[in-house]
Amino acid sequence: MTNIRKSHPLIKIVNESFIDLPAPSNISAWWNFGSLLGVCLILQILTGLFLAMHYTSDTATAFSSVTHICRDVNYGWIIRYMHANGASLFFICLFMHAGRGMYYGSYTFMETWNIGILLLFTVMATAFMGYVLPWGQMSFWXATVITNLLSAIPYIGTNLVEWIWGGFSVDKATLTRFFAFHFILPFIISALAAVHLLFLHETGSNNPSGVSSDSDKIPFHPYYTIKDILGLLIMLMVLMTLVLFSPDLLGDPDNYTPANPLNTPPHIKPEWYFLFAYAILRSIPNKLGGVLALALSIMILAIVPLLHTSNQRGMMFRPLSQCLFWLLVADLLTLTWIGGQPVEHPFIAIGQLASVLYFSIILVLMPISGTIENQLLKW
């Protein structure tokens, strides 16, 4: 009799994805982030579901319903802070996962990479809409500022913004639709993640050396299940440390003030994980130019595979490209810092310099370094 694990139509899919999956024997801890993202997504959906049971998406009661969750609902405070800080952890894992893909040349799996970019956009949209829901000062003003950017689109901009708002300003209609979208998008993300995995399993995983590992595969279970569980325990420990010791560390104090359309906060800024893109947006004095730069800062990932000039896949044996990669990481950290600073000297100049460097590294310097390394290997 055949093992049910291998014959049952449903269990067979799980078996081929997580148990008998042939995996390269040399993949490092950088390959843990895929499973961590899956856990983050499940955690966010579950905590979000319980929050939605007590939340009301009405401008008059949204803020007080969040306060009610934290004060009166059994363990409501821990659910709320796990959801808020879980989002931060989600983005840390996302950035590391995408960074791993860039470093080791995983972007040569074009379908997987492009679905990944689509996932990044969807997660960013979900997080943005979730930030609006508590209806604090920063929720309201960030929603106003970010949605207003669409008015820079020629001809249809103003109509588009009013259509998204459901009126002439961010109000009850906006909050209600943002809640609806924030609820549905994680399920769309789950479907996209399944497609992401489907395309990945068509080709098999990449590995640090960038060389085909077909001759040296090991089963996913028990080797990588154990490895993933270790990563998961570390992540949960970080999350719970954050939630139980300093839950508001990554939040904004302004969001503890109920939304007031008549009072603008001195510094409007999004959550920390959007600051790099926000800094790029602010570094261009022209509105349309800033919006284009903002969109391109993420969409540029789609052309990374087309700019690959090296004869080697990953950067493991490419010291020049490694230097550029870590310069890019440092540049993104600089942009994140600048995004949280006021618009004044010297932050404006630093932001503009960091923005130019960001695009230069990806579009110009990395392809050049690949070509130089090819030449060096010939000599």
Curated annotation (Swiss-Prot):
A ubiquinone binds at H201. GO terms for cellular component: mitochondrial inner membrane; respiratory chain complex III. GO terms for biological process: mitochondrial electron transport, ubiquinol to cytochrome c. Heme b b562 binds at H83, H182. It is found in: Mitochondrion inner membrane. Its cofactor is heme b. Keywords: Electron transport, Heme, Iron, Membrane, Metal-binding, Mitochondrion, Mitochondrion inner membrane, Respiratory chain, Transmembrane, Transmembrane helix, Transport, Ubiquinone. One of its GO terms (molecular function) is ubiquinol-cytochrome-c reductase activity. Heme b b566 binds at H97, H196. The chain crosses the membrane at residues 33-53, 77-98, 113-133, 178-198, 226-246, 288-308, 320-340, 347-367. Binds 2 heme b groups non-covalently. It is a multi-pass membrane protein. Its main location: mitochondrion. Heme 1 (or BL or b562) is low-potential and absorbs at about 562 nm, and heme 2 (or BH or b566) is high-potential and absorbs at about 566 nm. The cytochrome bc1 complex contains 11 subunits: 3 respiratory subunits (MT-CYB, CYC1 and UQCRFS1), 2 core proteins (UQCRC1 and UQCRC2) and 6 low-molecular weight proteins (UQCRH/QCR6, UQCRB/QCR7, UQCRQ/QCR8, UQCR10/QCR9, UQCR11/QCR10 and a cleavage product of UQCRFS1). This cytochrome bc1 complex then forms a dimer. PANTHER family: CYTOCHROME B. Component of the ubiquinol-cytochrome c reductase complex (complex III or cytochrome b-c1 complex) that is part of the mitochondrial respiratory chain. The b-c1 complex mediates electron transfer from ubiquinol to cytochrome c. Contributes to the generation of a proton gradient across the mitochondrial membrane that is then used for ATP synthesis. Belongs to the cytochrome b family. This is Cytochrome b.
